[in-house]
């Protein structure tokens, strides 16, 4: 995340497109038929979004490239993330992303999950969130994601990944969490 933040100011659409097209072609040569990419929306220029939407069109005949509008610097933590995420969706990005554990507080993380799931539900989109990417057993945003999935009727349209905090959670809590995750689809 830190390195990406350092690179962002110097990025160009051409460089992003070139790298993405080379990767897509390499992936297809190895037998891959689908890729899901999380595209940072915290840069107000939306260079990566525009570049990857162009790449998506170019590779469409031979590769299913799904794009996730991803508030890399946090939905609430980054000043323009909400506005930029909505712009990215309006431009054609088809999946709502999130990174609740990167918010400043646990409460902001929970609120970001709700806000992002609400946006997805209102637009009929899928959700793909990086949740709880830490060793902290108290990082429990996957619980919020599972609950919001049920509340907003998003079953079957939500992916939670990078759930590394689960290995640190106590068995009692996990015994309640896993059934909730299963119920949420």
Which ranges hold each PLM region?
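A structural signal for isolated positions on well-ordered beta-strands in alpha/beta enzyme cores
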Residues: 36, 66-68, 128, 159
